[in-house]
Amino acid sequence: MFNLFKKKQIPSINHQHKNLLISLPLNWKYEFEEGDQEACFDPKSQSTLRLNVIKVTPPEGKTPEENIKDLTVNQPYVTTSKGYLLTKPAYRESLEDGNNITLVTWKLINYDGDEKTIAVLSYTVLSEEKDSEQEKEIFNLLENSLQNSELLN
């Protein structure tokens, strides 16, 4: 017997932006923006995910713990299934073009080697829509995708 109440998963594909390989919704569109950043969005929604990948070299003389604190900006983090550091989402409310928006930001950090790769993902959603069923599904997909994403060399 099948479950009539089982939620249908959002169809997704693997998407690569620079060194970041992440699973995102199949129907999303992609645009490059200024500063080597990429915007990803559902054409039927006003929400946007921005991807930015940077490489940094921590200063010499700091302990690994101090470097992690600097890279995560002292945010709580977890270690993903691939061994990367993933900061917990940081929320910021703002006003943009007369609309209340919520900006949710994650950092995915490859801590191996001398040069560290950091993927910064920022999801912008209208504050009035952030608790909608659709946005909750997208948010869960992003969280799960980040847990399984890769930062390629």
Question: What is each stretch, according to the model?
Answer:
Residues 4, 12-70, 94-95:
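Secretory pathway targeting signatures of secreted, lumenal, and periplasmic proteins
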Residues 28, 120-153:
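Surface-exposed amphipathic alpha-helical segments
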Residues 47-50, 87-88, 117-123:
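Glycine-rich, often proline-containing surface loops adjacent to acidic residues and nearby aromatics
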Residues 55-58, 72-77, 153:
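A general structural signal for short secondary-structure boundary/capping elements
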Residues 67-118:
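Signature of long, low-cysteine stretches enriched in small and polar/charged residues
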